[in-house]
């Protein structure tokens, strides 16, 4: 009651004519984060729904929790296993020793705590750097700060390596927010996924920090390829020899970015999004169908020089960022197709493209990021042709 009174008391200072009128978006951001927005429709029709933008974004953040928790655990696990051979150094190791947690990879709490020390700084920098530019654009344009940035910041954090320098983290999210969203008008008007735009910028601007064998496990001197990179060079059949079974990849105890290693965690999040009706199942069906069909075709064609031709669809499903991208990027409602038939086509295009990039392009074993951005670009065109086809069909029916 006291907090509500506080907001009501200072609100006139931020309204039109008030002393801090220009900073109303900042006030509205904090107030609507704590309380349900008071905005209602002023004229008919009055559509009632149990869900609003704030709740949608909250649900998406909730859906990422399994990926966050397992991402911290796996980052700590991979780090602690490497420390056993290469030793510990840096301020994080000092904090771990001060807390008496230790570096035992068999201790889940030690793994989570160590992973938290990598996840938290990246997330804080992402939230602050991107949030500053969100507020700047909101103040200049005179509109509210949308909750969509909470989702963008979380997804962005989950798709970067744990070793990413913090200044690069800030640069990437700023690029994603400004170029991927705000230049098109802000949340709801962007046709590209801002988190992926930021990640793509870092990949092409600083490839040595975003790929390779030394960026996944934050231990000095350690080098280890991802399962997808091993498959690209030696074939997926060699993965068990490297200690990577299919179930390891499904659970996520392999090298990779924070949130992308665990297919299980991503599927739990996707199931939640389907239950609350935020994710559209047509996008998922299309993406899975495109991936399964094209990977099966390449399996049938075969290749003596490219081992990726032999990778079956169920390995594509658990390796790289496919599952995470399917759960949180493909189903993102703003940048995806909006027609029902278009959603099948859009999903199938992404499923086709991710296999195409992984198999045909030898320089880039992970293809989900580029495949989704490619799909984002074509989504409006797909919807256009679907709508035009429907118009022509209805016109012929009425002749």
Show where each model-derived region lies:
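A beta-strand-loop signature enriched in Asp, Gly, Thr, and Trp
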Residues: 284-340
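Loop-to-transmembrane alpha-helix initiation sites
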Residues: 170, 191-195, 314-321, 343, ...
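Central hydrophobic cores of alpha-helical transmembrane segments in multi-pass inner-membrane proteins
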Residues: 122-136, 173-181
